[in-house]
């Protein structure tokens, strides 16, 4: 199997991996004859990210089913999993080596002409190949000008992937906004802030975070801090919200969705029903939707949730409206909203055969005696002990450094315009 990504889409691909790494340290690949799907699920099963790249995203898309994958039979879909940190290392190592060569040449009197040529060296395309057999690797080949080829190999393991079952048509609260506006607003919240509350109030939407008192090592915050930013209703391209519905979710995963949408230059849309039920954040890029992303996050259930008296006016506004419209909520509609909420819950199902698949259902109350599902053991080889095969989540400093390098590096070409989470997934032992 071989996939070729042009210089034009290289930056988008790097940002996809970067923001998926904010959710978990592993990324699942699902490949069929029409598309490549990248997914990641965090350890607490409270956040999920999915990015679909269609054939039109690639300059070349060659898919060959492998008889050695999973079932032992020819399958129309290939599924595998890789650590995401080595993939980030590939891009960062390439950027670092390129910058180092330029800086060294600038420090020599005789190397001015050579450094100028180095600056003009760009990656023309990337070839991604997947091999099986004795050497199971995902191979990245960076084809640069002047015949320079940089090759990196990442080990993978066979896996079963999960896909969301989310009925956004049943979500009565939704909005859409330019992701650049949202990115500028969430920069007011600290990197270590865990939660974010979204609340509509009188034609505006409030984003609120609360940081408790912290006295730990070098982190000292003597007083609790609450930060609130307000979004005017006119900033939304479309909005339809019940003012009594307030949701609280993880800021880390929410930030990943917003930053990816902003880097792609798209608007981001959100769908949710009530607090305690998952929220969907989605966006796409391209005339033919070459890139489509979905982030599904668990929300925290507060003590006053599902209180009919808390439902206020319903606020609706479209992009063509000159002003927001406040519609008094029909008192008989509140119970209906509560009754319909469960249909907006999210489930997960493996993509295996129907007779062997399992369903993972949304839940917020996990029995105390239930142990979280352990990750499958991972076999390692001597080659995987190489520094390139690093495991674990990259910290925020590494992610910011990578993001800055991608933004500044000429090789990427032009920019294209725990309150505790119980988790939204618990495994149902009954096979369907």
Swiss-Prot record:
Instruction: Enumerate the residue ranges of region (Disordered).
Output: 363-389, 409-432
Listed GO molecular functions? Answer: protein kinase activator activity; signaling adaptor activity
Gene name as annotated: rad9
Q: Which organism is it from?
A: Schizosaccharomyces octosporus
Tell me the protein's name: DNA repair protein rad9
Q: Which domain of life is it from?
A: Eukaryota
Keywords linked to the UniProt accession: DNA damage
One Pfam family hit: Rad9
State whether keyword Magnesium applies: no
Q: Which GO terms describe its cellular component?
A: checkpoint clamp complex; chromatin; chromosome, telomeric repeat region; cytoplasm; site of double-strand break
């Amino acid at each position: 199997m071989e996939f070729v990504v042009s210089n034009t889409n290289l930056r988008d691909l790097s940002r996809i991996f970067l923001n998926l790494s904010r959710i978990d340290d592993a990324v699942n690949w699902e490949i069929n004859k029409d598309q490549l799907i990248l997914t990641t699920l965090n350890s607490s099963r409270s956040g999920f990210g999915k990015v679909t790249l269609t054939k039109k995203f690639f300059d070349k898309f060659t898919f060959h089913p492998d008889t050695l994958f999973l079932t032992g039979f020819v399958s129309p879909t290939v599924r595998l999993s890789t650590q995401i940190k080595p993939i980030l290392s590939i891009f960062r190592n390439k950027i670092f080596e390129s910058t180092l060569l330029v800086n060294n040449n600038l420090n020599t009197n005789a190397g001015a002409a050579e450094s100028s040529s180095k600056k003009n060296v760009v990656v023309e395309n990337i070839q991604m190949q997947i091999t099986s057999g004795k050497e199971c690797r995902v191979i990245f080949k960076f084809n640069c000008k002047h015949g320079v080829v940089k090759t990196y190999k990442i080990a993978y393991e066979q896996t079963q992937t999960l896909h969301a079952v989310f009925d956004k048509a049943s979500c009565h609260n939704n909005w859409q906004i330019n992701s650049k506006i949202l990115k500028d607003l969430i920069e007011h919240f600290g990197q270590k802030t865990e939660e974010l509350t979204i609340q509509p109030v009188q034609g505006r939407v409030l984003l609120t975070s609360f940081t408790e008192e912290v006295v730990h090592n070098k982190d000292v915050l003597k007083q609790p801090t609450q930060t609130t930013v307000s979004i005017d209703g006119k900033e939304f391209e479309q909005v339809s919200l019940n003012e009594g519905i307030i949701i609280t979710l993880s800021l880390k995963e929410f930030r990943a969705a917003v930053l990816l949408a902003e880097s792609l230059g798209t608007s981001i849309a959100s769908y949710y029903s009530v607090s305690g039920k998952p929220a969907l954040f989605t966006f796409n890029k391209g005339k033919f939707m070459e890139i489509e992303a979905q982030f599904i996050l668990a929300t925290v259930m507060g003590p006053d949730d599902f209180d009919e008296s808390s439902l206020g006016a319903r606020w609706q506004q479209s992009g063509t409206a000159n002003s927001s419209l406040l519609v008094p909520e029909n008192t008989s509609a509140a119970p209906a909203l509560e009754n319909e909420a469960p249909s907006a819950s999210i489930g997960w199902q493996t993509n295996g055969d129907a007779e062997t698949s399992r369903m993972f259902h949304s839940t917020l109350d996990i029995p105390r005696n239930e142990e979280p599902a352990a990750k499958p053991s991972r076999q390692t080889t001597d080659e995987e002990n190489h520094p390139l095969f690093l495991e674990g989540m990259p910290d925020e400093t590494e992610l910011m450094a990578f993001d800055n390098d991608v933004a500044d590096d000429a090789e990427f070409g032009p920019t294209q315009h725990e309150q505790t989470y119980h988790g939204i997934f618990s495994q149902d032992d009954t096979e369907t």
